[in-house]
């Protein structure tokens, strides 16, 4: 319907992005706004499919073009990460936990941004604030969002509020967070059927570092050895994407969630390489720099890159 209000997350949707759209649309519905519907800005990943199937929730509609649509943005606030033609949409609200980006609106809107580990944490608190009871299914989705985005609380983005929220939500949905989180990780780590392109673009975001156009992707696995056979294919795909996406550099975080480390694959211009090496205090060897204790793109990869390229 033309009058629908779409709650939508970022492109290359992850579990927090998709479940936040569903749970926030549900909250709006409970508050009497029946024209609010959840949407996804692309195909959902294996982990999210697992979560939705587990809690018997239908996947949201896919929204590819925001022209003339009424939208509420969740889990992002940057044009490069949003549905196409987002600046031709009527943006009504933004709920997010990332740095303030470049999306602009023609009027004041409700903008809720908090330094927590997941948008799901914010939305759970909004149910409470509005006195709306959380169903077992919605509790499960929000718990999954937090576990996914904080990598089972291991990420430096994780806060006490995230942990306390999961504790509350787990009681409502009746699931053990650690057990459920490990099942989610298994679903996310299953890369057998994934192509190099799937791996690169499965969780891919674009950034502008003082004029340096960059793409930063991430794939989380339980063992980096699983990715070794596809490494050259992935690098070839990254080089191809440099041209097709008109970027100066691409970084792909190959993250081992068990060892809590990331192999940062790099392709890009000589100037971008210099900035990348400066950001991570090392030399690129075989197209990568390996970093212990690096799990979070938001907190451990983007800030050093921004700083390195700052003019």
From Swiss-Prot:
Chain positions recorded as Mn(2+) 1 binding sites: 10, 14, 75
A GO cellular-component term linked to this record: cytoplasm
**Which keywords does this Swiss-Prot/TrEMBL entry list?**
Hydrolase, Manganese, Metal-binding
According to UniProt, the name of this protein is Manganese-dependent inorganic pyrophosphatase
Tell me the name of the encoding gene.
ppaC
On whether Membrane is a keyword of this UniProt record, the answer is no
Family stated for the protein in its record = Belongs to the PPase class C family.
- For Mn(2+) 2, which residues are the binding ones? 16, 75, 97, 149
In terms of SUPFAM superfamilies, this protein maps to: DHH phosphoesterases
- The reply on keyword Transport is no
Give the E.C. number(s): 3.6.1.1
Q: Which reaction does it catalyse?
A: diphosphate + H2O = 2 phosphate + H(+)
Q: How does it assemble?
A: Homodimer.
Q: Name one Pfam family in it.
A: DHHA2
Check the record and name the SMART domains matching this protein.
DHHA2
Q: InterPro entries this protein is in? A: DDH_dom, DHH_sf, DHHA2, DHHA2_dom_sf
What cofactors does this protein use?
Mn(2+)
The note on cofactor binding and number reads: Binds 2 manganese ions per subunit.
Give a GO molecular function annotation for the protein.
inorganic diphosphate phosphatase activity
